[in-house]
Amino acid sequence: METMGRHVISELWGCDFDKLNDMDFIEKTFVNAALKSGAEVREVAFHKFAPQGVSGVVIISESHLTIHSFPEHGYASIDVYTCGDLDPNVAADYIAEALHADTRENIEIPRGMGPVQIKQAQAKVL
């Protein structure tokens, strides 16, 4: 099935509090994840929240990687979207391992498959 991209949404639970709260660690992890998947890094932007948490994005030529971390819950919300031949699971796996996630739930969505076609219901009067 040909797509314009693949989008992995990853729910990470049981992650290390200190890693989820360390902006520099998360930034390096995301850049390395992008590079490991074969992506070309274009822009990097991360923000540290008070009292805890980090959000950020790595823009790649092939799309993006994002995170929103909730250290107090040991939870991270991860998106990895790639176009072309890159496998987003390579980056998502790298990130999950780096954050020491105990539990991981993934959904992979093919992107750019065309508009969703919904057929109109036709009713007959009896």
Swiss-Prot record:
<feature type="modified residue" description="Pyruvic acid (Ser); by autocatalysis">
    <location>
        <position position="63"/>
    </location>
</feature>
<keyword id="KW-0949">S-adenosyl-L-methionine</keyword>
<comment type="subunit">
    <text>Heterotetramer of two alpha and two beta chains arranged as a dimer of alpha/beta heterodimers.</text>
</comment>
<dbReference type="Pfam" id="PF02675">
    <property type="entry name" value="AdoMet_dc"/>
</dbReference>
<comment type="pathway">
    <text>Amine and polyamine biosynthesis; S-adenosylmethioninamine biosynthesis; S-adenosylmethioninamine from S-adenosyl-L-methionine: step 1/1.</text>
</comment>
<dbReference type="GO" id="GO:0008295">
    <property type="term" value="P:spermidine biosynthetic process"/>
</dbReference>
<dbReference type="InterPro" id="IPR042284">
    <property type="entry name" value="AdoMetDC_N"/>
</dbReference>
<dbReference type="InterPro" id="IPR042286">
    <property type="entry name" value="AdoMetDC_C"/>
</dbReference>
<keyword id="KW-0865">Zymogen</keyword>
<keyword id="KW-0670">Pyruvate</keyword>
<dbReference type="InterPro" id="IPR017716">
    <property type="entry name" value="S-AdoMet_deCOase_pro-enz"/>
</dbReference>
<dbReference type="InterPro" id="IPR016067">
    <property type="entry name" value="S-AdoMet_deCO2ase_core"/>
</dbReference>
<dbReference type="GO" id="GO:0005829">
    <property type="term" value="C:cytosol"/>
</dbReference>
<feature type="active site" description="Proton donor; for catalytic activity">
    <location>
        <position position="83"/>
    </location>
</feature>
<keyword id="KW-0745">Spermidine biosynthesis</keyword>
<keyword id="KW-0704">Schiff base</keyword>
<comment type="function">
    <text>Catalyzes the decarboxylation of S-adenosylmethionine to S-adenosylmethioninamine (dcAdoMet), the propylamine donor required for the synthesis of the polyamines spermine and spermidine from the diamine putrescine.</text>
</comment>
<feature type="active site" description="Schiff-base intermediate with substrate; via pyruvic acid">
    <location>
        <position position="63"/>
    </location>
</feature>
<dbReference type="InterPro" id="IPR003826">
    <property type="entry name" value="AdoMetDC_fam_prok"/>
</dbReference>
<feature type="active site" description="Proton acceptor; for processing activity">
    <location>
        <position position="68"/>
    </location>
</feature>
<keyword id="KW-0456">Lyase</keyword>
<feature type="site" description="Cleavage (non-hydrolytic); by autolysis">
    <location>
        <begin position="62"/>
        <end position="63"/>
    </location>
</feature>
<keyword id="KW-0210">Decarboxylase</keyword>
<keyword id="KW-0068">Autocatalytic cleavage</keyword>
<comment type="similarity">
    <text>Belongs to the prokaryotic AdoMetDC family. Type 1 subfamily.</text>
</comment>
<keyword id="KW-0620">Polyamine biosynthesis</keyword>
<dbReference type="GO" id="GO:0004014">
    <property type="term" value="F:adenosylmethionine decarboxylase activity"/>
</dbReference>
<protein>
    <recommendedName>
        <fullName>S-adenosylmethionine decarboxylase proenzyme</fullName>
        <ecNumber>4.1.1.50</ecNumber>
    </recommendedName>
</protein>
